[in-house]
Amino acid sequence: MEMALRPQSLLCPRSRLKVVIRPASSASGGGLAQYFLMTRRYTGSRIVRCMVSSSDCPNRKAKRTISLHTEVASSRGYAPRIAAESSIQEREHINSDEETFDTYNRLLRNESTEWKKLDTTEVDLSQDVSSSSMRKVDATDEAKLDILEDDLPRNLLNGVTMGEVDMLDEAGAEDDVFEVDLSALHNSTVGKMDAVNEVGTENDLFEVDLSALHSAAVGKVDVVDGAKAKEDLFEMDSLALHSVTMGKVDAINAAGAEGDKFEVDLSALASNNSMIEAVNVMDEAKAIEDTLEVDLSGNATSSSTYGEVKFEVDSLGNTSSTVMYGPADGAYEPRSDEVTFKVDSSENASNNVMYGRADVVDESWADEGIFEVDFFTNASSGAEYGKVDVVDEAKTDDFTFEIDSLEKDSNNKMHGKAHMVDEAWDDEAIFEVDLFGNASSIPIYGEVNVLDEARADDGKFEVDLLGNTSSNSTHEEVDVVDEAQTGEATFEVDLLGNALSSAIYKEVPVMGGAQDDEVDVDFSINASITETEKEADAVDEARVEDETFDMDLVGKQISIDSMNDDVVEEGTKHHRYPMLSSAFIEVKTIHETPVSLKPELMSVVMDQEQDKPISSVYQQEGSIFNLHAENQSTVDFHEREQMAITFDKQKESVAKLSKEDQQTAGLPEQNMSFDGVHRKSQSIIGLPFQHQSIVSSPEKYRSIVGFHGQNQSIISSHKQDKSIVGVPKKIQSIVGSTKHDDSIVGFRKQDRSIVSVPEQKQSIVGFHKQDLSIVAVSEQNLSIVAIPRESQSKQISIVRRHDPLHLKEVETKDRDGISKKSGGDDDLPHMLFEEELSQVEDVARAIAYKKQHEVDVISLTPDIQESPQDNIDPQELRRMLQELADQNCSMGNKLFVFPEAVKANSTIDVYLNRNLSALANEPDVHIKGAFNSWRWRPFTERLHKSELSGDWWSCKLHIPKEAYRLDFVFFNGRLVYDNNDSNDFVLQVESTMDEDSFEEFLVEEKKRELERVATEEAERRRHAEEQQRMGEQRAAEQAAREQAKKEIELKKNKLQNLLSSARTHVDNLWHIEPSTYRQGDTVRLYYNRNSRPLMHSTEIWMHGGCNSWTDGLSIVERLVECDDENGDWWYANVHIPEKAFVLDWVFADGPPGNARNYDNNGRQDFHAILPNAMTNEEYWVEEENCIYTRLLHEIREREEAIKIKVEKRAKMKSEMKEKTMRMFLLSQKHIVYTEPLEIRAGTTVDVLYNPSNTVLNGKPEVWFRWSFNRWMHPSGVLPPKKMVKTEDGCHLKATVSVPSDAYMMDFVFSESEEGGIYDNRNGTDYHIPVSGSNAKEPPIHIVHIAVEMAPIAKVGGLADVVTSLSRAIQELGHHVEVILPKYNFMNQSNVKNLHVRQSFSLGGTEIKVWFGLVEDLSVYFLEPQNGMFGGGWVYGGNDAGRFGLFCQSALEFLLQSGSSPHIIHCHDWSSAPVAWLYKEHYAESRLATARIIFTIHNLEFGAHFIGKAMTYCDKATTVSHTYSKEVAGHGAIAPHRGKFYGILNGIDPDIWDPYTDNFIPMHYTSENVVEGKNAAKRALQQRFGLQQTDVPIVGIITRLTAQKGIHLIKHALHRTLERNGQVVLLGSAPDPRIQSDFCRLADSLHGENHGRVRLCLTYDEPLSHLIYAGSDFILVPSIFEPCGLTQLVAMRYGSIPIVRKTGGLYDTVFDVDHDKDRARVLGLEPNGFSFDGADCNGVDYALNRQQSLLGLKPAVGSTPSAKGSWSKTGPGTGLPWTTLNCTIQLTNFEAPIQRWQEKASIGRYYKLNETWLKVKIFYLSCRYKLTQTWFKVKIFYLSYTYICRIKTLYSMHKQLWEYVSAMFPILSFNYEYLI
């Protein structure tokens, strides 16, 4: 059986070599595990491991296992390459006709319903072999989250080494987990390392476990790194017997924590010179300096202090027969300046065993931290000496770490010293290690010097290891230059030995671009037995596109002798390879190597097209390839099959070291290793600027591997879409992994604790806070793995299934490749260069592939079940499949699956008989499908010809656990389909999931996605707001500085002018003694009042200041009369201010506030210059700083006040919305309501219905029909439900379950289950909003076409409605635009970013289109170039023609701009032509999806246009419910009443808000309404020159037209003035006659009632705000009013409306006496006064009722309601007070009549009778007999058209007279005279 991977995948280049995986044989007949990676675009990838039968054991059952504990996340569908290799054991070749691998599908999916950006990869490595080695590398990259988990069960014998490294990079995760488990038996080392690098984590957890038996090391490392972490946890524990070191280190590093702990426990359990040490460290965030010194010696006591941290050690012991024991406890005082540690140790043991404990305090934010430990023992068989000196300065110049170890042993002596200086923020970082030993057999000397300059121009890293041993000596030198942001970086390693006479030296210089990093690596070793040379040349180009990586590994067997130079044009790179040509080294190395360690010949798979290998080398331990048996080939899934490592433009990989040469500077096995924990970027070995950490403790051989740069990795690095993973044999890494079973979970700060680990599995690891690098520990091999944050994301290539290739063919090519190996050296650089150049082509090809093939993917989940065929003998399986195939073929079935029972979370084989399908003649067969009715995980997969007899094609499909049904079709990859006769193929899946539960699952998935999007959006907004805030702060600081400079300049000029006029004295007037004085002195000022203005005053006071009164009045002294014959002299003692240069003063006859007469030197004041007083520059600088500080403080106070106001306003707005929604729900409670009243998604509600108020009254049954989301919910219209009676018997009830994705519940009622009569709310249905939904209502596109818009073109309420309505709808999330004519009078200052967008021609006229923002609304202005809108008015001449052209231009603009609105909303007669123009000319165009909404704002004008628009529109509305009933009988409306609705207008609460209104003197809410209205009232009186008295003010804001009741307005003016009130009127008349009439009235009233009335006969928007706020009442006496906004604004500002009951006034104002019940039904409260009549008596009746308010004060603490009223009322009245600022006492309001009684006669009130009416009306030229018929027919003649509402004779008489009398002044009749 054979297995192949197809390279033509989404991101694999087509030019890549095809790779074949061959099975390995073993003695037992089982094949070695093969790994395949299956990924999907959005969720993840999976590793499937298969045991495949090989030719030598054909009967062995193929075993396929699935790893259960690994997940890999990838957001882009990338997946890592996988290196798969066979066993060491030799095996026979398998011919192509003997056996092949099963071809595994690569299941890809891209689902629209799953929004997780998560890729999962799983790895399970297990084997039970002897003397074998196995390696598996998996890397996964992800932009947000990378998770990979691994389980390493091992059962190893002697000489077996296995390792695995799992790394996890979670860019946005909350926790970091890093775990390593190393265990081995008998000189074996098993290592595992889990690394988690988390940029934004909350916790940092690091754990290491090392345990070993018989000189074996077992280690576990768990690392969590978080750049913003609050806490770092470090834990280590090790246990060993027989010369084994054991220690435990617990470290907590909290950069911002309140307290940190660090504990140390050292213990030993060994009989022969064992030492157990543990160090516990406490890191405090706020300390200044930490110093720790420990000196433990057999008979010594040491105490030392460093800086401000004290550490004392007192030890006593007898080494001959005692044991040393020492505890150390640390005490830390947060924020203190001194920390003291004391250690007292003593020895009481017989075998020289040392036990110690130390507690250490480290401060990650300290200025300097020093850690020093000195341990010394004098045991006969083993001694150790160590010293550690650490200086941790996160932002200082030095970081020093020193280790000095000395072991005095007869056979093994070692001296080591390590010194490190790391500067995370400075120009230089130095790291030194000096290890020197004088032992006779294995002396080692080493020195490491590291220079790391994260921001400098040069960095060096040097290692020099020199040995003088006869059998084995080593010299190493490493020179590293790390330039994270510079143009060149150099990395150089020189390994040179002196054992042989020949040496190998290689140098590879690389030159890059301006932004490149250059790295030179030179490794060489000369030894008598083995020689190894390695060289790696890496170029890191952080900002360029191309890069080249060249590595040559020459080890125990050197197969490549030389390479040609290579010059790359892009990012110039030079390669030089000087090598020794002697073949003796290679041959001798191979022959002298023990058999068990000999490398085997190994080749990279060849390119089949060129039949040429990239390179073929012998196995080199530590390289990318592993040890193999003879004639075995290994596949490494790199994008271009590279020998060692590739790297990309942003990431670097440095080198791979062999087993013998991979070492890290640290302590020997017998010595304790110390690990540094620091704040930013500091560790033990060569760390980059922000990504550094090293931990190591190998057994004997120590070396240094440095890494550097911003984001660099030792093991691997990537290009933009490339992942290379290669590690040494014993240290293997998997990028991004965790383990389910035994990972250590990081906790949040408040919940975190130190997590314990197994007793014998603890070791040490150093780590840092931002980016984590990991070092795995093994017996003789040490690999340094750096996993930068960016190198683990966005750079994973997908390995897809390859076409099958025969093994024999591959083996032949392998042999050809080996035979051509000698010539491969010349080709390798060229091939590597070609590989780099092909990367851009690969990316382009991948993009093209994506566009052409939208292939959705499915990934295998981590808990996938085993297929049944895995446990079946292959031959038996084949027999079963053949039987099924024959059976289905005989039955005519073209399809079957195996296993026949399809279960969720399993894998099936799908077989298709191509001959029986529509694809019989097609060469390619694909399957396309999805799950759960095509709603979940769509996929496309290719079928392959199976081995079954017949034309059976097959593939494997994974059934996800969420599936309950599989839907699919077959096709040829293009247009030919077999879809089961248009029915699709369907397979039912045995699953716990059903359709309902799947719906719930989708809802939850959607909810999670919405939460994620909301979180991202909130973070984006927060970041934008922060950037804006910082920008505003910088601007404010700059403005404050400029203002300060201006003020200083003014002061300088003023003081300069003052100095010229100042004097030291004035003869015979004033003088100062002493004559010489300075600032701070006290002097005596003399004043002669003789002949001065104060000559007769009994008291004289001095009022003074300094420097031209800069600080105001600061000196006040009373003068004392002195006895002087030369005049009337007075004096006072005056203290001169410190900053005074000129003294200023005047004299007065009293102290400030009581003085009446002054002597101010003739209005010039008195000025005395201080002697020798000269202002210096320092004074002005200080003065400028003071002014700047004051201004800045004022700015910050204003900003803080604004912030508080915005928050409060948002809260008030939210409360108002909630209250409005509640009122809306209560407003229809008499018909239907729900319990609970507010419906929440995911809950159950009861719908209660009262049919007695509907068309279903009296019906025996009522059925409830409902759905959700405007009847568009996926569940559709649900089956009708019969309603049942409630306990009260008045309502019917139905219980409804609300899904989680519902945002609106829609329902109607019917009389039967089949339908019948419906109650559908007059065709609009019932709709109740649902809160808490995880779905949002889809936005709709609305375009308003109008001729008015506030505030830029306003005539009446239409302008306000257009703006307010548009803003309100836009706030709901919809897309709103407004189209408006561009008037030449328009105030363009209110239009933001006004500019020309386009132009077009209509009927020969060019229309220019402008665009701008008005009140945050998108507005398009249409400007015809014929000047139609250049007249300076909205309504004027030829309005019909002008507005007709505008309407057609608006529709043409929408068409030509490509807009597709859902709703086109036209307003009033002026834009009514839109309705019929659209239906006649645009209904079949791109605008066909639009619907026309027409709103009538006033039927008084353009009735014929309105009637035509009513015919063509889809829906029509007017601005209030009452007005819709009043005009329903109009000829333009009546034929279309079925689509006519009344919807009440509203105001914009953001525009009309007293809390933010800048046109009123004081902002106020319900909390300070009294103070706010008092301030506004005073400002209003002052503005109009009114008397500042506490009387009621009646405000009138209106257009002066007959509709507005101008005769009632005049009457109200006179009546208010008669009762000592004040009146303010703001408005103008479009009719010049009415305007002139009011001008005469104004002149008359202003003269007669000066200071009590003011008529402002114009319109002033800012002034209207002040009138609304300062008035107590707002009068709106309209004869008719469609809606009216004035009363709404009045209530918003706390003024009581007095209105006439008509139209919208009746709908919004509820009389405090008559409308209590009506308000209660609607969930409101009474809020004003209203009257019925249209005469003066009605106005009087409303005004006089204020007498009921005598002695009442406004309620404080009330809040405006949604309508603008207040929620609390005045005592005893029920009146909601928004209004009065004081007690309202209308004591002079004399009412001529009392309140009307409903049953009273007409004669009682008007002293008129029916006879009088008949006579007088006839006299008024009615000329008709006044009969009852006349009243009914001719009442219209008297201008009242609503008499039909009057039902009783009394009402008719009463109201008739009101209407008749109202007409008298209009007709110029004096009815009093007539009477």
From Swiss-Prot:
The protein's name in its UniProt record: Soluble starch synthase 3a, chloroplastic/amyloplastic
E.C. number: 2.4.1.21
Location in or out of the cell: Plastid, Chloroplast; Plastid, Amyloplast
SUPFAM superfamilies: UDP-Glycosyltransferase/glycogen phosphorylase (SSF53756)
Keywords: Amyloplast, Chloroplast, Coiled coil, Glycosyltransferase, Plastid, Starch biosynthesis, Transferase, Transit peptide
Molecular function via GO: alpha-1,4-glucan glucosyltransferase (ADP-glucose donor) activity; alpha-1,4-glucan glucosyltransferase (UDP-glucose donor) activity; starch binding
Glycosyltransferase in keyword set: yes
Reported consequences of knocking out the gene: White-core floury endosperm. Increased content of resistant starch (RS). Endosperm containing increased levels of amylose. Reduced content of long amylopectin chains with a degree of polymerization (DP) of 30 or greater. Reduced content of amylopectin chains with a DP of 6 to 8 and a DP of 16 to 20, but increased content of chains with a DP of 9 to 15 and a DP of 22 to 29. Decrease in average length of amylopectin chains.
Pfam families reported for this sequence: CBM53, Glyco_transf_5, Glycos_transf_1
Coiled coil: 1007-1065
Tissue expression: Expressed in the endosperm.
Reactions catalysed, as given in the entry: [(1->4)-alpha-D-glucosyl](n) + ADP-alpha-D-glucose = [(1->4)-alpha-D-glucosyl](n+1) + ADP + H(+)
Task performed by this protein: Involved in starch synthesis in endosperm amyloplasts. Plays an important role in the elongation of amylopectin B chains.
Source organism of this protein record: Oryza sativa subsp. japonica (Rice)
Transit peptide limits: 1-49
Family: Belongs to the glycosyltransferase 1 family. Bacterial/plant glycogen synthase subfamily.
